[in-house]
Amino acid sequence: MNTFFMFGKYTSESIKEISASRTKQAVDVIKNLGGEVNAMHILMGEYDLLFCVNLPGNEEAIKASVELTRLTGIMFNTCPGIAVEIFDRLVKK
């Protein structure tokens, strides 16, 4: 499994439909792609939301981003994350 950080921005339309049931639907999108949600946070600043998810790969991350935007109207910027331990191993001299 790979870790992805999904930064979301509300639109004027998507904010009208905020609900706990839509949050559950968003979690179901990730699960249906073979993933899991590690954390969901509301942010103050450039982005409104941050989802930390595990997904099998890049293709599932792309599908998740598109499906969540279709479901919610929220625009997502999805970035892969690499554990520091893996990074340290990769750059070891």
Annotate each PLM feature.
Residues 28-29, 67:
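Generic structural signal for isolated residues within well-ordered alpha-helices
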Residues 8, 41, 80:
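A cross-domain feature marking catalytic cores of carbohydrate-active enzymes
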Residues 8-10, 51-56:
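Short beta-strand-to-loop capping motifs
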Residues 34-41, 76-77:
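A short linear hydrophobic-aromatic micro-motif
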Residues 42-54:
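Amphipathic, hydrophobic secondary-structure cores in small proteins
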Residues 25-26, 64:
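Hydrophobic alpha-helical segments typical of transmembrane helices
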Residues 55-82:
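An amphipathic, aromatic/His-enriched active-site/gating alpha helix that lines ligand/cofactor pockets
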Residues 1-25, 31, 36, 47, ...:
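Short S/T/G/P-rich N-terminal loop/turn motif that feeds into the first structured element of a domain
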